[in-house]
């Protein structure tokens, strides 16, 4: 299945304002990260350069592990601020909300998908009581005709639906956030019969995810039921590991 591209449209004025806001946020994250690493290790590093190499990323995660030991409050704030700022830019880093596992039409996929984050509200005192509520709005833009059973879509049609995710800390005592969640390791996997080594740089947060999904009108609800039925209601919640390091990468790179 080909991955859907998420599209967004902004005016030139909005883009200019956004760029200024993003630059300020990224600069703040870089400065905070640099200060925490210096506090924990005594080293003053260029995080912009370090985060572009495997060795640099490993050293950064190791340094943040030390930082979490000596200053858990500010290290927690840094990691969660990076997550929130990334989400505000449209980067969630949670594959489930990209619907990669959904089975789309087998031949050609006659639509694109747009996603907009309406709000992303985060509250916490520590990782133990982290709680996030958000609203994501999606649009199917049909650029071709499609028909299957009682569902039809015409070129130019638009279908709209909203996703309401809730993200909380995993209550399992064995999955609580600790210094053991700062991971740098090599993993051997097979690709096309050949063994390759993959580097993993993770700061792992074990979360409990739940969400509801609703079409904005009857036709859109049919689209949801057709393509997203397995996602329509998951209010009981399930475990998912989220890599917090990717948000630092996203903002700094």
From Swiss-Prot:
Membrane topology: Lipid-anchor
Keyword Membrane in record: yes
Pfam families on file: Lipoprotein_3
Transmembrane domains' residue ranges: none
Residues anchoring lipid (S-diacylglycerol cysteine): 26
GO CC terms: plasma membrane
Subcellular localization: Cell membrane
Keywords (A to Z) from UniProt: Cell membrane, Lipoprotein, Membrane, Palmitate, Signal
N-palmitoyl cysteine: lipidated positions: 26
Signal peptide: 1-25
Predominant cellular place of this UniProt entry's protein: membrane
Matching PROSITE patterns: PROKAR_LIPOPROTEIN
Family from the record: Belongs to the MG439/MG440 family.
Name this polypeptide is given: Uncharacterized lipoprotein MPN_369
């Amino acid at each position: 299945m080909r991955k859907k591209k998420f599209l967004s449209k902004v005016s030139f004025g909005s883009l200019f304002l956004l760029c200024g806001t993003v630059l300020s946020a990224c600069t703040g994250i870089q400065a905070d990260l640099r200060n925490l690493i210096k506090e924990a290790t005594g080293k003053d590093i260029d995080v912009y350069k370090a985060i572009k190499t495997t060795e640099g990323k490993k050293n950064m995660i190791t340094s943040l592990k030390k930082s979490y030991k000596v200053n858990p409050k500010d290290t927690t704030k840094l990691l969660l601020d990076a997550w929130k700022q990334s989400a505000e830019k449209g980067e969630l880093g949670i594959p489930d909300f990209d619907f990669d596992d959904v089975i789309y039409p087998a031949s050609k996929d006659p639509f694109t998908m747009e996603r907009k984050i309406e709000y992303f509200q985060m509250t916490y005192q520590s990782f133990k009581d982290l709680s996030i509520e958000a609203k994501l709005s999606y649009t199917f833009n049909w650029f071709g005709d499609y028909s299957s059973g009682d569902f039809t879509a015409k070129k130019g049609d638009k279908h709209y639906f909203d996703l309401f995710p809730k993200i909380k800390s995993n209550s399992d005592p064995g999955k609580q956030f600790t210094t053991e969640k700062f991971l740098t390791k090599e993993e051997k996997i097979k690709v096309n019969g050949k063994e390759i080594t993959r580097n993993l740089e993770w700061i792992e947060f074990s979360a409990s995810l739940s969400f509801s999904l609703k079409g904005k009108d009857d036709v859109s609800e049919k689209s949801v039921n057709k393509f997203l039925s397995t996602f329509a209601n998951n209010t009981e919640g399930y475990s998912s590991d989220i890599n917090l390091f990717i948000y630092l990468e996203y903002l700094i790179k």
